[in-house]
């Protein structure tokens, strides 16, 4: 840190609190140095590198049911950074608006978001607390009326009423807390008196600590002087004389110019040193022969966890550590607050009054971590508090930061940072650099600012100037040493580049006005209000608002529950962050004796550093460059290994969790982080890269899910924006309706009156507001005009109704009617008498018109009636004529059918032979009287009926003749007509068939032919029915005729075989042909086989 002028700068480096702490440790621990501890405190917050990619503290845990905590996976490794992308512009916990958690539908905070084990919420200084031995639960309600219960001390909440505890109402807490406020005020007064007594005791112990420090420093200087080589003694003596002269001049200049602040004064002479050793050896801090220091060792017991190494110039606390991988960083010890209990194993010390309790999702002052985040307390091994009933100790990285933790901007307790300057910084007296150079996985170089937390690809101007200064310093000492380097016990400084002092003013100039305003508007401190779910929050611009973690509600005005409470006023008047700063300022004012001691210590430490500078100049520069390069490569390799380890771990988890669930969680992360749908992947990456859900998908799947999210979210954002605009317009219209202003008012008058209304401000553009106003005014004027018109019509209709009640006619006079109706309110509703008379005349005219129109309507009605009657008559006549025609048609049809029946009866009686003709028969039929009954029939119809009668007679005779032939058993298939004629000629059926013998013969031959065809078909059927004949029959017949005889013997039992006895040759041909056909077909298919015609063609 830069000196702020004279003694004030020295007092910052060494204050009474530090000496007091060193003295207490010296009195407490009288044994050797404690055993080494690999877990050590990291460098100061401003000297830490940027957080690795993919590692962040994470968002607040999601809502969980009461009394539940999520499982913790101790095997979860730190998430590695993605390759090729610099760190984001700010820590993850500052990338969202403060105190703006997502809506939880008015639910109380789940217990999982309460403070972790070992860190109970405590009250702010001066606020009343509840009885520590009594567990009290408070019944409260959410805005929507749901009842829930919360612990008045731990803020733990539940939906169900707890058993076995005291439950009170919210209103009962106020008198209880008011009574306890007085008791606590007395306790505070006693605590202040004790603190003053302790301060006096510590001041007395400072002199003893200084004397011990001088004795130890002299002993170490003598031991080191004897170990130095004789060849280097003269060179070091000469260099020491030169350095002492320079240091004395600097000390005198500082003493003379104490009142003139400088920005380029040397850094405080507080250095860090490390030594290399095997895993079994230890690392200890050493000083040169001219340095004066006092070593105070802190032993540890078997039950205690070794604390981190802390070393200062005066007094120096030296701790031996094995730490093969961790580099011990020496810092000035901080005095523990009065209320800070000592550290015990497996616990994190928490102040009871110095650090207030905080609601979930709020950034506490001094970066008090939330559950799952490390607590960087000075002098205490870093531990990670997880959401389960145990504390896990986590090893720190080389930078002293826990894996996955972003560097905090403000330390919890302001430490006096001891910065070891390199030779270049001592020679140039430059400030600590804000920028640090890093490399991505693919080798690209980027630069990170430790203060503003921003990163850039281009090299900052500050680093360019620093490199130029280093080159100028190295120019006169570029002669390489050819002599072999002697073996040394101390390890060279592993720093990559000289560290400059911190410059405050240039950093402030780099920030823009908007960034400064945003920085000031962020919350810096908070204090809970006992007995209520509300907390008081202070911002950087000295503003105060109230936050309810139960309902996730923030408001500038004081809630109704807190109005009239004196303890709330006291909390607001005494901000905890300001009180802590005042106490820190008091500790920084030293006594005159201390200033003289500090000046002497500063001169001795400066001589030591100058001697180390001369030794380092004589060393081989190429060797240092190689070592620095190896260290850089080791850092890069370690980062790559961490990234690969995290990727492997994430790949294992991806193999367990289904892709759909991982994609859903990734989309939820994009939505929670406020990723814009109208931006690119590269611009939005810094919002999500530190979220643990970022590694749920591989790079390709992340890009695909992001593209899908952008497509869907873009439409949703447009819809939300449109709905928001519509809602704002509706609210603006509602505001104008509630205003009830005159429609003739101007927009300027309206805007001046309602400019402070939130609904007025919701419409961003003044042009849109004026357009909505003009539209509303136009609608109001139109409505007013319509109302006026409607009101006039109503008055007119009421006046006409009044006149109609008096049964006026066209002969009525206004002078007579006026006297009858002037007392009626409907008469008075008309404004003027002239308008009343005009309305009367209109009514009389209307009556006259109504009379004329009624007469016309009556005439028209009569004409319509007559026309309808005539039309009906025509329709009736038409229907009647159609019915008559139908009846006549049916009558004629009936007569025709009757005539046909009579004619057929006549033909049946008169025509008995089928050999007669129509011409001959017609003469005979004419003589019968029934001939006249068929007069309705035409000649062609009569002839047609005659031919049908003759065909029926012929068919009947033929059937009888064939029946005769069937009954004649002597007839065979080979019989002739001559043979048969002799047999049947005497039968009446043969005689009636026909008188022509040729006709009978032709009919007989046709009968024999039909019978022969039928006999052959029946015989084929018989062969198919005979199972004895198979496809093997032909082969058997060829071998022997006996098989054929057997077949014939079997067939002889059937009549169908015997019918063909007259043609045995033809019968045998049929048998042989059937056997050949079976042989050609071969074996029959199985019963389950389909027929060839039904087989599939596929």
Swiss-Prot record:
Induction: Up-regulated in brain tissue from patients with Huntington disease.
Positions bearing Omega-N-methylarginine: 20
Positions of modified residues (Asymmetric dimethylarginine): 28, 30, 41, 48
UniProt-listed GO biological process terms: mRNA processing; negative regulation of transcription by RNA polymerase II; negative regulation of transcription elongation by RNA polymerase II; positive regulation of transcription by RNA polymerase II; positive regulation of transcription elongation by RNA polymerase II; RNA splicing
Motif Nuclear localization signal: chain residues: 626-630
FF domain residues: 659-712, 725-779, 791-846, 896-952, 954-1010, 1012-1077
SMART domains: FF (SM00441), WW (SM00456)
Tissue: Detected in brain neurons.
Phosphoserine modifications at: 11, 638, 834, 933
Subcellular location as annotated: Nucleus
Domain notes: The FF domains bind the phosphorylated C-terminus of the largest subunit of RNA polymerase II, probably mediate interaction with HTATSF1 and preferentially bind peptides with the consensus sequence [DE](2-5)-[FWY]-[DE](2-5).
Protein name: Transcription elongation regulator 1
Species: Homo sapiens (Human)
